[in-house]
Amino acid sequence: MKRFLLSFVLILCLVFGINNHAIAKDNIEAIETISQIGSLANSGNYMQALDKCNQALKKYPKEPDLYYWKASIQSSINQKHEALENFNKAIALDSKEATYYVVRGICKMDLNDYTGAEADFNKAIELNPNDATAFTMRGCAKLAQGNIDGANNDLTKANELVDVQEGIISK
């Protein structure tokens, strides 16, 4: 039964994009809460998701995924500076999660900090060299800074990665 439950939780994490932080803490309630927040946010119920996230952060203040979701929601409702603070908190708690750097970089681009965004995309690529989104966004940051050749190289690499990933999926 325990093995089945763990398998079910891992499937939920894959479906809802949850990292393994809450799993490492062996806390099913935290996983369920993060899943609910993600579902609310993904369906456009931002204020309800934000409220649930704030409540969860009182209970799980060291859970980086909660800061990630809070920041993502804040970014969606145009609270970019607040979002940046929460992306920073997520990264402070887990500096090995490439996704956090990508989304923080996107937030920095929204704030016209293209140099900072490029640095975040560099870190994401260092952590996950097959992240097509990181290459795409770094290309956009380079383009915004006038580095057309660098942007072209990154966008070409992103396309190659997408082609490889599509090939794997279609097999």
Go through each PLM region and give its residues.
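Alpha-helical tetratricopeptide repeat
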Residues: K2-K171
